[in-house]
Protein backbone atom coordinates (compact mmCIF):
# COMPACT_ATOMS: atom_id res chain seq x y z
CA UNK A 1 0.00 0.00 0.00
CA UNK A 2 1.31 3.46 -0.91
CA UNK A 3 1.43 6.29 1.60
CA UNK A 4 -1.14 9.00 1.15
CA UNK A 5 1.02 12.11 1.08
CA UNK A 6 4.28 11.10 -0.53
CA UNK A 7 5.58 9.18 -3.49
CA UNK A 8 7.31 6.19 -1.84
CA UNK A 9 10.68 4.88 -2.90
CA UNK A 10 9.01 1.73 -4.23
CA UNK A 11 7.62 3.84 -7.08
CA UNK A 12 11.01 5.23 -8.16
CA UNK A 13 11.34 2.76 -11.04
CA UNK A 14 7.77 3.40 -12.11
CA UNK A 15 8.52 7.14 -12.21
CA UNK A 16 11.60 6.35 -14.31
CA UNK A 17 9.31 4.52 -16.74
CA UNK A 18 6.98 7.55 -16.86
CA UNK A 19 9.95 9.79 -17.67
CA UNK A 20 11.56 7.54 -20.28
CA UNK A 21 8.28 6.76 -22.02
CA UNK A 22 7.44 10.46 -22.28
CA UNK A 23 10.91 11.20 -23.64
CA UNK A 24 10.30 8.98 -26.69
CA UNK A 25 7.01 10.42 -27.95
CA UNK A 26 8.20 13.56 -29.82
CA UNK A 27 11.82 13.32 -31.12
CA UNK A 28 10.73 11.66 -34.37
CA UNK A 29 8.55 14.72 -35.12
CA UNK A 30 10.82 17.55 -33.96
CA UNK A 31 13.98 16.05 -35.46
CA UNK A 32 12.70 16.44 -39.02
CA UNK A 33 12.41 20.25 -39.11
CA UNK A 34 16.13 21.09 -38.75
CA UNK A 35 16.95 18.51 -41.46
CA UNK A 36 14.04 19.43 -43.73
CA UNK A 37 16.21 20.71 -46.60
CA UNK A 38 18.30 17.51 -46.72
CA UNK A 39 15.28 15.22 -46.36
CA UNK A 40 13.41 17.09 -49.08
CA UNK A 41 16.38 17.05 -51.47
CA UNK A 42 16.91 13.28 -51.20
CA UNK A 43 13.32 12.05 -50.99
CA UNK A 44 11.76 14.54 -53.39
CA UNK A 45 9.14 15.69 -50.87
CA UNK A 46 7.98 19.27 -51.42
CA UNK A 47 6.73 21.64 -48.73
CA UNK A 48 3.29 20.03 -48.53
CA UNK A 49 4.86 16.57 -48.66
CA UNK A 50 7.12 17.50 -45.76
CA UNK A 51 4.03 18.70 -43.88
CA UNK A 52 2.69 15.14 -44.15
CA UNK A 53 5.58 13.96 -41.95
CA UNK A 54 3.82 15.80 -39.12
CA UNK A 55 0.23 15.37 -40.35
CA UNK A 56 0.37 11.56 -40.70
CA UNK A 57 1.61 10.85 -37.14
CA UNK A 58 -0.88 13.34 -35.71
CA UNK A 59 -3.75 11.72 -37.62
CA UNK A 60 -2.73 8.32 -36.32
CA UNK A 61 -2.44 9.69 -32.79
CA UNK A 62 -6.03 10.82 -33.19
CA UNK A 63 -7.46 7.68 -34.78
CA UNK A 64 -5.77 5.21 -32.44
CA UNK A 65 -6.45 7.27 -29.33
CA UNK A 66 -10.11 6.30 -29.77
CA UNK A 67 -9.02 2.67 -29.64
CA UNK A 68 -7.01 3.18 -26.44
CA UNK A 69 -9.74 2.13 -23.96
CA UNK A 70 -10.54 -0.98 -26.02
CA UNK A 71 -6.85 -1.89 -26.37
CA UNK A 72 -6.38 -1.55 -22.64
CA UNK A 73 -9.45 -3.67 -21.92
CA UNK A 74 -8.48 -6.39 -24.40
CA UNK A 75 -4.69 -6.60 -24.18
CA UNK A 76 -3.88 -4.74 -20.96
CA UNK A 77 -2.05 -1.45 -20.44
CA UNK A 78 1.39 -3.01 -19.91
CA UNK A 79 1.36 -5.13 -23.07
CA UNK A 80 -0.04 -2.25 -25.13
CA UNK A 81 2.67 0.17 -23.98
CA UNK A 82 5.56 -2.29 -24.44
CA UNK A 83 4.40 -3.25 -27.94
CA UNK A 84 3.94 0.40 -28.92
CA UNK A 85 7.44 1.33 -27.74
CA UNK A 86 8.86 -1.54 -29.79
CA UNK A 87 7.05 -0.13 -32.84
CA UNK A 88 8.56 3.30 -32.12
CA UNK A 89 12.04 1.78 -32.02
CA UNK A 90 11.48 -0.07 -35.30
CA UNK A 91 10.12 3.03 -37.06
CA UNK A 92 13.18 5.10 -36.17
CA UNK A 93 15.59 2.29 -37.11
CA UNK A 94 14.00 1.94 -40.56
CA UNK A 95 14.82 5.59 -41.31
CA UNK A 96 18.41 4.47 -41.85
CA UNK A 97 17.26 2.90 -45.12
CA UNK A 98 14.78 5.47 -46.45
CA UNK A 99 15.35 6.53 -50.07
CA UNK A 100 11.97 7.83 -51.27
CA UNK A 101 9.20 10.09 -50.06
CA UNK A 102 6.78 7.18 -49.75
CA UNK A 103 9.23 5.27 -47.57
CA UNK A 104 9.68 8.33 -45.36
CA UNK A 105 5.91 8.66 -45.00
CA UNK A 106 5.72 4.95 -44.17
CA UNK A 107 8.12 5.39 -41.26
CA UNK A 108 6.13 8.44 -40.13
CA UNK A 109 3.00 6.28 -40.06
CA UNK A 110 4.74 3.54 -38.07
CA UNK A 111 6.09 6.06 -35.56
CA UNK A 112 2.73 7.78 -35.28
CA UNK A 113 1.06 4.43 -34.56
CA UNK A 114 3.47 3.65 -31.73
CA UNK A 115 3.14 7.09 -30.14
CA UNK A 116 -0.65 7.00 -30.52
CA UNK A 117 -1.06 3.79 -28.54
CA UNK A 118 1.22 4.97 -25.74
CA UNK A 119 -0.56 8.32 -25.46
CA UNK A 120 -3.98 6.67 -25.41
CA UNK A 121 -3.14 4.21 -22.63
CA UNK A 122 -0.55 5.92 -20.44
CA UNK A 123 -2.64 8.65 -18.71
CA UNK A 124 -4.89 5.90 -17.32
CA UNK A 125 -1.82 4.17 -15.85
CA UNK A 126 -0.82 7.44 -14.18
CA UNK A 127 -4.31 7.92 -12.74
CA UNK A 128 -4.36 4.31 -11.48
CA UNK A 129 -0.90 4.20 -9.90
CA UNK A 130 -0.72 7.79 -8.59
CA UNK A 131 -4.33 8.89 -7.90
CA UNK A 132 -3.25 11.40 -5.22
CA UNK A 133 -0.41 12.80 -7.31
CA UNK A 134 -2.03 13.00 -10.75
CA UNK A 135 -0.96 16.62 -11.31
CA UNK A 136 2.66 16.03 -10.33
CA UNK A 137 3.13 12.79 -12.27
CA UNK A 138 1.22 14.06 -15.31
CA UNK A 139 3.49 17.11 -15.19
CA UNK A 140 6.54 14.84 -15.18
CA UNK A 141 5.17 12.82 -18.12
CA UNK A 142 4.32 15.97 -20.09
CA UNK A 143 7.67 17.60 -19.26
CA UNK A 144 9.60 14.58 -20.50
CA UNK A 145 7.43 14.45 -23.61
CA UNK A 146 8.36 18.06 -24.35
CA UNK A 147 11.96 17.43 -23.32
CA UNK A 148 12.07 14.62 -25.86
CA UNK A 149 11.01 17.17 -28.45
CA UNK A 150 13.96 19.35 -27.46
CA UNK A 151 16.29 16.38 -27.64
CA UNK A 152 15.11 15.47 -31.13
CA UNK A 153 15.49 19.01 -32.47
CA UNK A 154 18.94 19.44 -30.93
CA UNK A 155 20.46 16.03 -31.62
CA UNK A 156 19.22 15.44 -35.17
CA UNK A 157 21.48 18.05 -36.84
CA UNK A 158 24.36 17.38 -34.42
CA UNK A 159 24.40 13.66 -35.30
CA UNK A 160 23.68 14.21 -39.00
CA UNK A 161 26.46 16.79 -39.55
CA UNK A 162 29.56 14.68 -38.72
CA UNK A 163 28.01 11.63 -40.36
CA UNK A 164 27.09 13.73 -43.43
CA UNK A 165 23.89 11.71 -43.41
CA UNK A 166 20.47 12.91 -42.32
CA UNK A 167 19.35 9.29 -41.90
CA UNK A 168 21.58 8.89 -38.84
CA UNK A 169 20.18 12.12 -37.37
CA UNK A 170 16.73 10.52 -37.27
CA UNK A 171 17.51 6.81 -36.76
CA UNK A 172 19.39 7.21 -33.44
CA UNK A 173 15.99 7.61 -31.76
CA UNK A 174 15.52 3.84 -32.00
CA UNK A 175 17.91 3.36 -29.05
CA UNK A 176 16.02 5.23 -26.28
CA UNK A 177 12.72 3.76 -27.52
CA UNK A 178 14.12 0.24 -27.17
CA UNK A 179 15.42 1.06 -23.67
CA UNK A 180 11.98 2.37 -22.72
CA UNK A 181 10.34 -0.83 -23.97
CA UNK A 182 12.68 -2.99 -21.88
CA UNK A 183 12.20 -0.87 -18.75
CA UNK A 184 8.41 -0.78 -19.20
CA UNK A 185 8.30 -4.57 -19.59
CA UNK A 186 10.19 -4.97 -16.31
CA UNK A 187 8.60 -2.25 -14.20
CA UNK A 188 5.00 -1.62 -15.24
CA UNK A 189 2.50 -3.56 -13.12
CA UNK A 190 1.24 -6.73 -14.74
CA UNK A 191 -2.15 -6.46 -16.37
CA UNK A 192 -5.02 -7.60 -14.20
CA UNK A 193 -8.75 -7.83 -14.77
CA UNK A 194 -9.92 -5.75 -17.77
CA UNK A 195 -11.45 -2.46 -16.66
CA UNK A 196 -14.47 -0.47 -17.79
CA UNK A 197 -12.67 1.94 -20.09
CA UNK A 198 -14.16 0.55 -23.32
CA UNK A 199 -17.74 0.82 -22.03
CA UNK A 200 -17.05 4.24 -20.55
CA UNK A 201 -15.78 5.55 -23.90
CA UNK A 202 -19.07 4.76 -25.63
CA UNK A 203 -20.99 6.66 -22.95
CA UNK A 204 -18.58 9.60 -22.87
CA UNK A 205 -18.92 10.17 -26.61
CA UNK A 206 -22.55 11.15 -25.94
CA UNK A 207 -21.45 14.08 -23.80
CA UNK A 208 -20.89 17.58 -25.28
CA UNK A 209 -18.14 18.15 -22.69
CA UNK A 210 -16.05 15.40 -24.30
CA UNK A 211 -16.25 17.16 -27.66
CA UNK A 212 -15.44 20.53 -26.11
CA UNK A 213 -12.29 19.08 -24.53
CA UNK A 214 -11.36 17.55 -27.90
CA UNK A 215 -11.68 20.93 -29.61
CA UNK A 216 -9.56 22.74 -27.02
CA UNK A 217 -6.86 20.08 -27.02
CA UNK A 218 -6.82 19.92 -30.83
CA UNK A 219 -6.59 23.64 -31.49
CA UNK A 220 -3.78 24.08 -28.95
CA UNK A 221 -1.83 21.10 -30.28
CA UNK A 222 -2.37 22.41 -33.80
CA UNK A 223 -0.17 25.28 -32.66
CA UNK A 224 2.43 22.81 -31.43
CA UNK A 225 2.41 20.76 -34.63
CA UNK A 226 2.72 23.93 -36.72
CA UNK A 227 5.67 25.18 -34.68
CA UNK A 228 7.60 21.90 -34.76
CA UNK A 229 7.00 21.57 -38.50
CA UNK A 230 7.78 25.13 -39.58
CA UNK A 231 9.68 27.13 -36.95
CA UNK A 232 13.07 25.83 -38.12
CA UNK A 233 12.27 26.21 -41.87
CA UNK A 234 10.84 29.68 -41.12
CA UNK A 235 14.17 30.81 -39.67
CA UNK A 236 16.06 28.98 -42.43
CA UNK A 237 14.26 31.37 -44.79
CA UNK A 238 15.69 34.19 -42.66
CA UNK A 239 19.23 32.91 -43.26
CA UNK A 240 19.75 30.68 -40.23
CA UNK A 241 21.68 27.40 -40.45
CA UNK A 242 20.19 23.96 -39.77
CA UNK A 243 22.00 23.76 -36.42
CA UNK A 244 20.96 27.24 -35.24
CA UNK A 245 17.33 26.82 -36.30
CA UNK A 246 17.29 23.39 -34.65
CA UNK A 247 18.73 24.98 -31.51
CA UNK A 248 15.89 27.50 -31.50
CA UNK A 249 13.38 24.65 -31.73
CA UNK A 250 15.19 22.94 -28.86
CA UNK A 251 14.89 26.12 -26.75
CA UNK A 252 11.17 26.13 -27.45
CA UNK A 253 10.90 22.49 -26.38
CA UNK A 254 12.95 23.03 -23.19
CA UNK A 255 10.60 25.86 -22.22
CA UNK A 256 7.72 23.48 -22.94
CA UNK A 257 9.18 20.87 -20.63
CA UNK A 258 9.75 23.31 -17.78
CA UNK A 259 6.24 24.75 -18.05
CA UNK A 260 4.68 21.30 -18.35
CA UNK A 261 6.38 20.30 -15.10
CA UNK A 262 6.03 23.51 -13.08
CA UNK A 263 2.59 24.89 -13.99
CA UNK A 264 0.65 21.82 -12.75
CA UNK A 265 2.51 22.14 -9.44
CA UNK A 266 1.65 25.85 -9.18
CA UNK A 267 -1.96 25.15 -10.14
CA UNK A 268 -2.20 22.05 -7.95
CA UNK A 269 -3.98 23.70 -5.00
CA UNK A 270 -6.64 25.28 -7.20
CA UNK A 271 -9.69 23.30 -8.20
CA UNK A 272 -10.25 25.74 -11.05
CA UNK A 273 -7.36 25.43 -13.53
CA UNK A 274 -8.74 27.98 -16.00
CA UNK A 275 -6.73 31.04 -14.88
CA UNK A 276 -3.55 29.05 -15.47
CA UNK A 277 -4.85 27.81 -18.82
CA UNK A 278 -5.61 31.38 -19.86
CA UNK A 279 -2.10 32.41 -18.83
CA UNK A 280 -0.62 29.74 -21.11
CA UNK A 281 -2.86 30.87 -23.96
CA UNK A 282 -1.70 34.48 -23.47
CA UNK A 283 1.93 33.34 -23.74
CA UNK A 284 1.15 31.48 -26.96
CA UNK A 285 -0.61 34.52 -28.40
CA UNK A 286 2.38 36.73 -27.59
CA UNK A 287 4.75 34.26 -29.25
CA UNK A 288 2.76 33.84 -32.46
CA UNK A 289 2.14 37.60 -32.72
CA UNK A 290 5.88 38.20 -32.39
CA UNK A 291 6.68 35.65 -35.12
CA UNK A 292 4.22 37.44 -37.38
CA UNK A 293 5.36 41.00 -36.64
CA UNK A 294 9.01 40.98 -35.46
CA UNK A 295 10.56 37.52 -35.93
CA UNK A 296 14.18 38.71 -35.78
CA UNK A 297 13.77 41.06 -32.79
CA UNK A 298 14.16 38.43 -30.04
CA UNK A 299 13.77 34.93 -31.53
CA UNK A 300 14.97 33.13 -28.39
CA UNK A 301 12.36 34.95 -26.30
CA UNK A 302 9.63 34.23 -28.86
CA UNK A 303 10.54 30.53 -28.89
CA UNK A 304 10.57 30.40 -25.08
CA UNK A 305 7.17 32.13 -24.86
CA UNK A 306 5.67 29.69 -27.34
CA UNK A 307 7.21 26.73 -25.58
CA UNK A 308 6.05 27.76 -22.11
CA UNK A 309 2.54 28.44 -23.36
CA UNK A 310 2.23 25.22 -25.36
CA UNK A 311 3.82 22.99 -22.73
CA UNK A 312 1.86 24.37 -19.81
CA UNK A 313 -1.40 24.19 -21.74
CA UNK A 314 -0.78 20.58 -22.81
CA UNK A 315 -0.11 19.42 -19.26
CA UNK A 316 -3.00 21.34 -17.71
CA UNK A 317 -5.38 20.10 -20.43
CA UNK A 318 -4.49 16.50 -19.58
CA UNK A 319 -5.08 17.17 -15.87
CA UNK A 320 -8.44 18.86 -16.52
CA UNK A 321 -9.63 15.78 -18.42
CA UNK A 322 -8.47 13.45 -15.62
CA UNK A 323 -10.10 15.72 -13.00
CA UNK A 324 -13.54 15.08 -14.48
CA UNK A 325 -13.80 11.47 -13.26
CA UNK A 326 -12.51 9.73 -10.10
CA UNK A 327 -12.23 6.24 -11.58
CA UNK A 328 -8.88 5.62 -13.38
CA UNK A 329 -10.38 3.57 -16.23
CA UNK A 330 -13.10 6.14 -16.91
CA UNK A 331 -10.72 9.10 -16.56
CA UNK A 332 -8.26 7.36 -18.87
CA UNK A 333 -11.06 6.81 -21.39
CA UNK A 334 -11.97 10.51 -21.33
CA UNK A 335 -8.31 11.47 -21.75
CA UNK A 336 -7.95 9.06 -24.67
CA UNK A 337 -11.05 10.46 -26.39
CA UNK A 338 -9.85 14.04 -25.86
CA UNK A 339 -6.52 13.14 -27.43
CA UNK A 340 -8.21 11.21 -30.23
CA UNK A 341 -10.36 14.05 -31.47
CA UNK A 342 -7.70 16.57 -30.53
CA UNK A 343 -4.90 15.03 -32.55
CA UNK A 344 -7.19 14.64 -35.58
CA UNK A 345 -7.70 18.40 -35.41
CA UNK A 346 -4.01 19.08 -34.66
CA UNK A 347 -2.92 17.16 -37.75
CA UNK A 348 -4.30 19.78 -40.13
CA UNK A 349 -2.69 23.16 -39.22
CA UNK A 350 0.86 22.27 -40.43
CA UNK A 351 -0.54 21.25 -43.81
CA UNK A 352 -2.75 24.37 -43.94
CA UNK A 353 0.29 26.51 -43.08
CA UNK A 354 2.23 24.86 -45.92
CA UNK A 355 -0.64 25.51 -48.32
CA UNK A 356 -0.83 29.16 -47.22
CA UNK A 357 2.94 29.44 -47.66
CA UNK A 358 2.65 28.13 -51.22
CA UNK A 359 -0.10 30.65 -51.93
CA UNK A 360 1.51 33.69 -50.27
CA UNK A 361 5.23 32.88 -50.19
CA UNK A 362 5.35 33.42 -46.42
CA UNK A 363 4.52 31.73 -43.11
CA UNK A 364 2.79 34.92 -41.89
CA UNK A 365 -0.72 33.63 -42.61
CA UNK A 366 0.05 30.42 -40.72
CA UNK A 367 1.06 32.34 -37.60
CA UNK A 368 -2.05 34.53 -37.82
CA UNK A 369 -4.21 31.39 -38.12
CA UNK A 370 -2.83 30.23 -34.77
CA UNK A 371 -3.85 33.52 -33.15
CA UNK A 372 -7.43 32.88 -34.27
CA UNK A 373 -7.28 29.36 -32.81
CA UNK A 374 -6.02 30.70 -29.47
CA UNK A 375 -8.90 33.19 -29.29
CA UNK A 376 -11.34 30.33 -29.89
CA UNK A 377 -9.82 28.13 -27.16
CA UNK A 378 -9.82 31.03 -24.69
CA UNK A 379 -13.59 31.33 -25.15
CA UNK A 380 -14.20 27.56 -25.02
CA UNK A 381 -12.33 27.13 -21.74
CA UNK A 382 -14.68 29.64 -20.12
CA UNK A 383 -17.25 26.82 -20.10
CA UNK A 384 -14.97 24.30 -18.32
CA UNK A 385 -15.94 25.29 -14.78
CA UNK A 386 -15.01 22.59 -12.22
CA UNK A 387 -18.44 23.02 -10.64
CA UNK A 388 -19.90 21.62 -13.87
CA UNK A 389 -17.73 18.48 -14.09
CA UNK A 390 -20.30 16.17 -12.50
CA UNK A 391 -23.29 17.42 -14.47
CA UNK A 392 -21.33 17.63 -17.73
CA UNK A 393 -20.07 14.03 -17.59
CA UNK A 394 -22.78 12.30 -15.55
CA UNK A 395 -26.17 13.93 -16.08
CA UNK A 396 -29.01 12.11 -14.28
CA UNK A 397 -29.95 10.12 -17.40
CA UNK A 398 -26.46 8.61 -17.72
CA UNK A 399 -25.44 8.00 -14.12
CA UNK A 400 -26.53 4.36 -14.26
CA UNK A 401 -24.47 3.86 -17.44
CA UNK A 402 -21.35 5.48 -15.98
CA UNK A 403 -21.37 4.75 -12.24
CA UNK A 404 -19.03 6.48 -9.85
CA UNK A 405 -16.21 4.18 -8.79
CA UNK A 406 -13.59 4.90 -6.20
CA UNK A 407 -9.92 4.97 -7.22
CA UNK A 408 -7.40 3.08 -5.08
CA UNK A 409 -5.62 5.26 -2.55
CA UNK A 410 -2.00 6.24 -2.99
Language model segments and positions:
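Cytoplasmic helix-loop-helix junction between adjacent transmembrane helices
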Residues: 107-143
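Conserved MFS/SLC helix-loop-helix module at the cytosolic interface between two early adjacent transmembrane helices
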Residues: 63-102
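Helix-to-loop junctions at the C-terminal end of transmembrane segments
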Residues: 64-76, 259-272
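Intracellular juxtamembrane helix-capping segments at the cytosolic ends
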Residues: 117-130, 312-326
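Helix-loop-helix hairpin linking two adjacent transmembrane segments in secondary transporters
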Residues: 132-136, 140-189
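Extracytoplasmic gate region of multi-pass secondary transporters
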Residues: 32-33, 208-250, 255-260
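Helix-breaking motifs and short loop linkers at transmembrane-helix boundaries and internal kinks
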Residues: 44, 76, 97-102, 131, ...
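A late C-terminal transmembrane helix in Major Facilitator Superfamily
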Residues: 325-364, 370
Amino acid sequence: MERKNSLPAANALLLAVVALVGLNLRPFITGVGPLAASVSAETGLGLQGMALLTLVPMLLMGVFAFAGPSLQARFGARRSVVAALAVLSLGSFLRLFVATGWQMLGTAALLGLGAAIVQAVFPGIVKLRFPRHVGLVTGLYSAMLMGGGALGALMAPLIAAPARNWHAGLAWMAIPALLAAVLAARCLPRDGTPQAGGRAAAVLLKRPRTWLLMACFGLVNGGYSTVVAWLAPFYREHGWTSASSGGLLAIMAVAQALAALLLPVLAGKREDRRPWLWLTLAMQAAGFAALAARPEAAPVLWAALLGAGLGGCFSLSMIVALDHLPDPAEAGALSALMQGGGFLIAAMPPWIAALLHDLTGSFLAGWLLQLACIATVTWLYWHVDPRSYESAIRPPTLRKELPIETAPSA
